Amino acid sequence: MPLVRRRSGVYKRGEPNRKKGMPMPQSERSNVNNKNVLSVIMGGGAGTRLYPLTHERSKPAVPLAGKYRLVDIPISNCINSGLRRMYLLTQFNSASLHRHISSAYKFDHFAGGFVEILAAEQTPTTQSWYQGTADAVRKNLIHFLNNDFEYILILSGDQLYRMDFREIVEAHIQSKAEVTIATLPVERKPAGSLGIMQMDETNRITRFVEKPQEAETLDSLRIDPEWYGKLNIPEDREELFLASMGIYVFNRETLIELLDNDHTDFGKHIIPGAIKERQVFSHVFQGYWEDIGTIASFFEANLDAASDLPKFDFYNMEAPIFTHPRFLPASKINGAQIDHAVISDGCIINNAKITHSLVGIRSFIGAGTELNRVITFGGDAYESEESIRKAQADGRPRIGIGENCCIQNAIIDKNARIGNNVVISPEGKEENVDHKLYYIRDGIVVIPKNAVIPDGTRI
């Protein structure tokens, strides 16, 4: 049989390193390990819905819960699942993401792992940037296939959840699937913004509709209440739909074949076509999952970390969330009142009142300041006394939040300089505002990175 060159630049026969050390056939082994699974994390698009947080960074690089980045979630899930071979595909504003990955994830020579960043590039055979999730994977197949693996796990870089990926890969193997999609029961309101599907009694997916908008279409996709027991859904739940989590497991050969075309997106093109022709199965996930796609969802997911019983548990040391070790000192709190708040490493808080807020690393908060439902990203470094004096001489506040400020329902991005007697609140303003000093998105004020808010400003 002659060699056939695919659109991805990959030949069907004679793949790099495929012969030597070729994995055993699926039927001969069912265990999941670092040698037979390769993980690919999608770095995301331009992140327009998270703007201005994505003005200078990619979505996966957006800070999370005080000290982490969004990308730490899928990477930590992989590490906790024993899967240590990861590729991260990036394209937009990726400099800070590259710095974070290179400083946070260094496997030793004996661990058999890596987190390798593959930035979008132009080559003699590829002249365009990534056009979608499937296109990004297609353009990097040549790199993936330099590894021995039977299954490829494709993940999103901007979701909050904790999952043992060995379970979905094991289910994929046991069902003899060609593609397995992680799915989640959701209510009607979010269903219109997700890929919704139906499955039969064997969990094989029989129908898939990307972001259904028509009420009649949604009604036809409802989970039958008789299935609630099988899916471990409480009987009192109503109108549930089976949504794609954007997490996929593909057989190696299946992925190569499905990408032998010019389709650009998994959800819009690849998955609907595969359901008609392939063995595509659902793996139902019952835990907490949040798509951090908008300012509102990002804001609420972060503030939830300060609640009595957070939906996502950062304190679970059986499956910890890893990040860049900064070796910062403990936070110093002088006479402050703090209730339902998360205070990250290295903060200095002087006689402030903080409620239901999340304070990021190296944050400085002056005396008399009140924060209510506020997220601060903190600073990249501590200012020296000389730097503070120079800033004051130039008429700029120091990095952090000054004295006697009142801030509510706001996100303060990194290295922002907020002066004394500043008031920040979205109350009485439009839901979406663009201003030279601030933005309002979904009714939440966002102070951008490196912003300077003078003394006495009222927002």
Regions found by a protein language model. Give the residues of each.
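Short, well-ordered beta-strand micro-motif
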Residues: 63, 183, 198, 249-251, ...
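Residues at the starts of beta-strands that form the adenosine-phosphate
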Residues: 84-85, 178, 279
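Short internal beta-strands
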Residues: 88-90, 183, 411
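Conserved core of the sugar-phosphate nucleotidyltransferase
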Residues: 105, 162-249, 261-262
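Conserved N-terminal catalytic core of the sugar/cofactor nucleotidyltransferase
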Residues: 2-4, 10-41, 49-171, 199-201, ...
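Conserved beta-strand termini and adjacent loop/short-helix elements that scaffold enzyme active sites
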Residues: 118-120, 182, 283-285
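Short acidic/His/Gly/Ser-rich catalytic and metal-binding motifs that mark active-site loops
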Residues: 47-52, 217-220, 384
